[in-house]
Amino acid sequence: KTIKVGGVQVGAGKRVTVDLPVANLYTHTNLTMPVHIVNGRHDGPTFFITSALHGDELNGIEIIKRLLKRVSPKSLHGCLLAIPIVNVFGFLNQSRYLPDRRDLNRSFPGRETGSIAARIANLVATEIIAQSNFGIDLHTGAINRTNLPQIRADLSNPVVRKMADAFGAPVAIDAAVRDGTLRQYASREGKPTLLYECGEALRFDELSIKAGVRGIVRVLRVLEMLPAAPPAKIVVAPTYANSTTWVR
């Protein structure tokens, strides 16, 4: 099937990058949000991947970069919508927040004529989440706070639980959603969504990145978007938790 993002039609079997307009800087430079679209040759669901809603969280950017190299339109059933950097302002300034100190991941679903946070959230909600069936949002810990690779999700939802099991992170946390987050909005719209946390801000962590790429591939396989892999000799189930705490 054909999918339309930012006014650009992408046919089956195609790979395209679309620049969604975000805003202009005070220098009149156009600022855009690149969306990587891999539209499979075969019919199937649409899966979104978002990263860097907080501009200083880098692991997800590299996860998406590596994942896009592994996924081919020839073998994909459905469509992959990937945004490596949602908070482009924060990324350029190595900041968690937007210039007005708003937290983008407390601004969903946003609105078309609101603050810059509301406008970016609205853009993601209407152009990406609205067209998707499933998704995953990639995050890291804050500066000087390192997160063990973990999945946060509503594990009472059987589809979400199936996705979390397939991802295979060391820990899966049955975590309540927070108001205004992307995961809350997507879940409310009926889009089963995982949140992957790994590592710390402003750092690349190779272990976390590899685990993220492998995990997303496994989720795409269990959703039958990618061909099944040979059975693993050893299958390690995640440890399930209902709460977390920081070790200082």
Model-inferred region functions:
Residues 1-248:
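Structured catalytic-domain cores with a bias toward divalent-metal coordination
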